[in-house]
Amino acid sequence: MKHLIQLFLSLTLIGLTVTLNAQSRYLIKFKHKGQNAFTLANPSAFLSQRSLDRRIRYGIALDSTDLPVTARYVDSLRAIPTVVVLNVSKWLNQVSILITNTTPANITSVQNKIAGFPFVQSSSAIAQRIAGSSLPAGKQLEVADGTASQRATDLQADFFNYGSSLNQIKIHNGEFLHNIGLRGQTMVIGMLDGGFQNYLTVKAFDSARLNGQILGTHDFVANEANVNNDHPHGEQCFSVIAGNLPGQYIGSAPKASFYLFRTEEAATEYPIEEHNWVCGAERVDSAGGDVISSSLGYYEFQAPLQALSHPFSDMNGNTTMAAIGADLAAKKGMLVVNAAGNQGDPSDSWGRIVTPADGDSVLAVGAVSTSGVPGNFTSRGPSSDGQVKPDVASVGVATVIANQNNGISSGNGTSYACPNMAGLATCLWQGFQEFNNMKIITTLRQVGSRATTPNDTIGYGIPDLKKALINLTKEYSTASGSIATCKTTITWNSKDVSAMKYELERKAPGETGFTKIGEQAGKGNAFANRTYALSDSLINIQAGTISYRIRQIFDTTTATFAADYIDTITVNLTASCVTTAANPQNEVVLVPNPTPRDAFAIKITTTNAIQNLQIRIADMGGKTVHQSTHSKGPGTVLIPISIAGLAKGKYFVSIYGKGQLISTQELLKL
């Protein structure tokens, strides 16, 4: 990853000398996956159940890219003397190899043997061999300075005490998600980076380690499990998501689970790193990951493979290995979040986004300060095919991180903006797993600060995660209504917590506006799906169309109040529920009324017998508090009614015969 950040403050990069030998690493691409021992009919043999569940949830069909590379092909390469198989990509059907004897004669011999295999499509040099772990001249990964960051002041009673990371969460209203229980639980994030130095001892990850949130690690460069001794860049990016030091530092999704994969070779800049990136993404998919956070990017390669550098025309989302792999990851249902790059400074001859941020299914993230001012280094769009890039922006200027030396410091780069956004996007998706990855990306664009006027610096702008949750809730929620015996029952389904509430409003025939007729409190400590029902008395309502709308209040705090209408329904009242006393044949009297007791009687006089006489009592809000069924013959009958459980106040007593309203009387309980 070249120049992914050009601004680092005072901490000197780790460095050793690099020794480059003759070209020794090659990419072998196969023609097909013939004679494969695996079949799409038995996917559990090569994909985890969690990976399969994702495909089922979003209706994603398996295809040939899911099949492992034919083992016989790989074994044939491995059997060649001096050949070491490095990483295998099933999505791209290709293998990287190392030739340990780099004499010209041996290189030629190996190449000839490989070319003779009928299943080989091509063989190309992809990197030189490397000894050491330093950076080549000109290559920089952002590393935070050693200066402690000042703590922001938290004026709200949030679930987390964020300490110094408060402002980079609040710029997105991310604390709102955390406060309603969306903190990353049940979600799995795969991080692709250049190393996670000291992640095993950094205190900010104590809870992640103790709770088993780090599910696995792998180094695709050194082909080993250990990622603790490599470059600190990944550790710092990891802290932006997973850090958890109450009162000092909290990441954007501290309760998520993680895979930490090293795919970046910090000491070089060769195309093999794009191949490694794809291999890392594949492993996240196979393991059942939900999100990929990648603070890596590519466009220029070093000698002697500089001819393989990407022209800007390659930044179209469909050309580079990394972009193809990123879009395949998205096709498998994962949310891919990538740093836009840091070549935006006017002095940089490139100036544009880097791959795989150019992927059309990738959420590319630019960098701003906590005040929303873009960093002068953030790479500009659009992509070469005209896509708005970056898609959104997050805090990448003076981002607060937990560094590899157990300190809290700050640094600049889209590499830090990326995990901040990835973590919050993960928390949002946690609440709406009914929606797929692309719906989450679309929503984040729609709630950006420049949603209607995207530009080439921050794309659709800085997403508001509270607004995103409201929009997704509106799309998710449903409502229905039904009428029986002059009463509407409204049922709705939405997502909430106990701190939220609903207001039900009605517009009756002849009315020009809506009137609030009832409330319903939310339930539970975690944001989740719930179903509610309220009844509305239609006494004295004319026949016609009645409209109801449901307003969900998401944030009841005065300073941060947020509410929106989640659904509107209409019902048709076919017969009027208006009653009059002018009926010489029917008479209804409540005795005594007012009543000081816990009972009263209904004196009913009708000329005909009524076998299905229904009595319903409603309070002033329209809620039914009593309902009973009786029968009577012609003439007068006295029906006693107990109201022992009712509070003092005014009620409406309605009498129905054969489903038709006979009368409604007002009752006052003293």
Listing of model-derived features with the role each one plays in the protein:
Residues 469-484, 561-591, 607:
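Residue-level detector of functionally pivotal "anchor" positions at catalytic/ligand-binding pockets or at interdomain
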Residues 23-143:
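Inhibitory N-terminal propeptides of secreted protease zymogens
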Residues 19-21, 500-547, 551-561, 583-591, ...:
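C-terminal outer-membrane/trafficking sorting elements
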